């Protein structure tokens, strides 16, 4: 324990010596096997103000309700399949079970309507078992919903909807009943998985750990994983990881990328994007068609009829932009400044970047999402 305390003190001293670009190891990597697990359940929300499922269109809601009543010894008469339960809705319940969650702890849950319920506002979720992918029950959910949206409708058909009223959350709405087995304390090694695979970052993580703890303690498995030796004692292993996760490492620079969202017009250009020598010009043609009909009025005694004569005007306007030139190794700042000078819109910038990529002048990955 004394040695571990000395290592912690040394870690703090090393961390203080790094520059502003260094990041904690806990922020750029995770421990293999230490992760959250998804849970899901099916249940009923009751207490709705007439905004529940229309059970004639969602028969599974009525079936679920009848099954619940039968568990309390209440037998529903035959032929009640047309009963309308306006205050009940069938819902899906899901949550993330954190790593090392213990029985008795609570987790937040999300509740979403499955049927045609208009709103879950004001409802309460009845006891719902939540299962993992293995089919075992790991938590029990129940509680009053918090719904951020609402829905209102008038008799004349007018309607207003704010946000999504058919989904809500219950903070701390599920109680953990079973822990998920973890291999955290098994074996004499641990694997650190980088959030973003990068060979440079993996090498720097290995170098930093070995610099602090000694040669051979850490070994890179590939560009995304680093294996480190660890104590077998659980308490010492926790102290050991506390040291590692507070190490500050300077991550490697990301690959040059340009991200384009064609639906929203969003363009993100990475810091390392450069352009080879190229000349670019971009203009747009605007065609305007206007209708200005003329009324033809005949003379008083001519016997003719008044007629409307269509008259169309077509105008084409070409916006001319000067050609701008990119020199060798042009940086992001120079690209943005040059494009802004010609007044290019986001759509124009997309076309320019795509053309530069096709010409082989854009030294980056062009990703369209």
UniProtKB/Swiss-Prot annotation:
Location relative to the cell: Periplasm; Bacterial flagellum basal body
Disulfide-bond pairs as recorded: none
GO MF term list:
structural molecule activity
Matches recorded under NCBIfam families? PRK05303.1
PANTHER family documented for this protein: FLAGELLAR P-RING PERIPLASMIC PROTEIN FLGI, FLAGELLAR P-RING PROTEIN
Q: What does this protein do?
A: Assembles around the rod to form the L-ring and probably protects the motor/basal body from shearing forces during rotation.
Output this protein's name: Flagellar P-ring protein
Q: Which organism is it from?
A: Pseudomonas syringae pv. tomato (strain ATCC BAA-871 / DC3000)
